[in-house]
Design a protein with these regions (language model features):
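Conserved donor-binding loop and adjoining core beta-sheet/short helix segment
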Residues: 19, 25-78, 167-183
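Active-site rim helix/loop that mediates acceptor-substrate recognition in acyltransferases
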Residues: 19-37, 135-157, 161
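Conserved GNAT acetyl-CoA-binding A-motif
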Residues: 82-90, 208-218
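Conserved acetyl-CoA-binding loop-helix of GNAT-fold acetyltransferases
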Residues: 69-76, 187-189, 193-207, 227
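Acyl-donor-binding surface of acyltransferase catalytic domains
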Residues: 45, 50-117, 236-240
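Short amphipathic alpha-helix that is part of the acyltransferase structural core
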Residues: 1-24, 107-142
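Hydrophobic secondary-structure block in the mid-to-C-terminal portion of proteins
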Residues: 144-189
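Conserved active-site alpha-helix within GNAT-family acetyltransferase domains
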Residues: 91-99, 198, 218-236
Length: 240
């Protein structure tokens, strides 16, 4: 059975130590159950135990499940309800077409120091939007979502500046219970291969008490992130 939850505490009996749990729980912390564009579901077995949790932001879904989840029920649920995208691990083997990549994780804290550069923990979001590759995103909707998450301590934006100009930026798109998900790391082209990007990521990792996760494309950036202490943890799938 899959049910829409009405209160945050309905997820209290479920836990999984992975990136999808952080993503869902951070979204729930930020928006609670107060908005019709951010919805949350639980899948229950015959004994009433939660076997998976699901978040929906607009029409984009994330699924976190345990070993006893009902894959066929989830397949039927998404077929009936429709979706723009579904994000989960490779055990969420739905019949829809998908892209996939690698999940990485680290809890190693090694801060790198670069002379003449400073960290700004409260940058203007417009500056980040202009630097990052958000060609398919609408600034207003992106700004409303990210700023809302930041105000609720569920996300964080950081830049590395040289002479008061941004040379590199990164965002923790989800923060929950001292763990975080790193996304949208970017460096201005003329400042690449100079150590600024790795210095920023290292500083961001040190700012998180727990683990830091990321999702990368299967053939990109493995060496860069491994040098910063990240290890491959499995695969993500994005159904569309």
């Amino acid at each position: 059975m899959i049910k829409l939850i009405e209160k945050k505490k309905e997820f209290d009996d479920f836990f999984k130590d992975d990136i999808f749990y952080i993503r869902i729980m951070s979204l729930l912390k930020a928006y609670s159950t107060n908005y019709n564009f951010a919805l949350f579901y639980k899948q229950l077995d015959d004994n009433g135990n939660i076997t998976s949790i699901i978040s929906r932001l607009d029409n984009d879904y994330t699924v976190c499940h345990n070993d006893d989840f009902d894959l066929l029920e989830l397949e039927d649920f998404f077929t009936r309800i429709g979706f723009n995208s579904i994000l989960g691990d490779d055990e969420l083997a739905l019949s829809f077409s998908y892209d996939y990549g690698i999940i990485m994780r680290t809890n190693k804290k090694v801060e790198k120091i670069i002379n003449y550069a400073t960290i700004d923990e409260y940058p203007k979001l417009m500056d980040l939007f202009n630097l990052e590759d958000y060609s398919t995103a609408d600034f207003e909707s992106w700004y409303v979502d990210v700023s809302h998450r930041i105000r609720h301590s569920c996300a964080k934006a950081v830049t590395l500046n040289v002479n008061d100009e941004i040379v590199s930026s990164g965002i923790f798109s989800s923060i929950y219970n001292n763990d975080a998900i790193l996304t949208s790391v970017s460096t201005v082209p003329e400042f690449r291969r100079m150590g600024y990007g790795s210095a920023l990521v290292s500083a961001m990792i040190c700012d998180i008490k727990g683990k830091v996760y990321l999702m990368r494309d299967k053939n990109k950036n493995e060496k860069f992130y491994k040098k910063l202490g990240f290890e491959n943890m499995g695969y993500w799938r994005m159904y569309k």
